[in-house]
Amino acid sequence: MVKSNLQTILNSHCFVREKESNIPKMPVIELTRNKPESESSHRCSNPCPGPLWCSDVPLPPLKIPGGRGNDQRDHSLSAKLFYSDAQLLVLEEAPQSNSRVRFLLFERRCSVSKHLVWRGALKGTNLYIEIPTGVLPEGSKDSFSLLLEFAEEKLQVDHVFICFHKSRDDRASLLRTFSFMGFEIVRPGHPLVPTRPDAFFMAYRIERDSDGDE
């Protein structure tokens, strides 16, 4: 079984507190298996933006290769076809036993730019995406737009989360780019994200038309 760089921080509904350890890099999504669903999880409020979640936990380390080098190929060794069309290929990694989280790999088809794979975790109606380390290749914005469109139309998610390290050289550029795409910074202390002062979290809320609205 391939060890994923995207470890999990999601349990059935709420994050669990991580034991003290060295956390040198980016946050990731981690699943605690066999965690019973708590009654309090159903009472969580949703002070948007962001998904319905409870947490104040730090996140474990992250290193997302983003499709550069052999690490990317390792991700797809156990992955199966999830969706395919003329523009986008989506693979699903082999699920863990009793896992409620689905790990997906998104790749734009027919791209003339450097190969890029976005990796994310789907939990319920929320999709969590980590920004690959290093400089994003040309065309990455277009491929992420395809990901967002797929998340809205095919996955029917309510929110998309992204996270990246504050120490990135391209931090300002990432903030501008994702803000332009409709993402909002999730403020420190927000109940929907873990406490990580070294990381930026941004959230995209997918608005849906209501038949009852005038």
From Swiss-Prot:
It comes from the Eukaryota. The keyword Cytoplasm does not apply. InterPro entries: Acyl_CoA_acyltransferase, ODC_AZ, ODC_AZ_sf. GO terms for biological process: polyamine biosynthetic process; positive regulation of intracellular protein transport; positive regulation of protein catabolic process; viral translational frameshifting. One of its GO terms (cellular component) is nucleus. One of its GO terms (molecular function) is ornithine decarboxylase inhibitor activity. Transmembrane segments: none annotated. Keywords: Polyamine biosynthesis. Pfam families: ODC_AZ (PF02100). Ornithine decarboxylase (ODC) antizyme protein that negatively regulates ODC activity and intracellular polyamine biosynthesis and uptake in response to increased intracellular polyamine levels. Binds to ODC monomers, inhibiting the assembly of the functional ODC homodimer, and targets the monomers for ubiquitin-independent proteolytic destruction by the 26S proteasome. Belongs to the ODC antizyme family. PANTHER family: ORNITHINE DECARBOXYLASE ANTIZYME (PTHR10279), ORNITHINE DECARBOXYLASE ANTIZYME 1 (PTHR10279:SF8). Interacts with ODC1 and thereby sterically blocks ODC homodimerization. This is Ornithine decarboxylase antizyme 1.
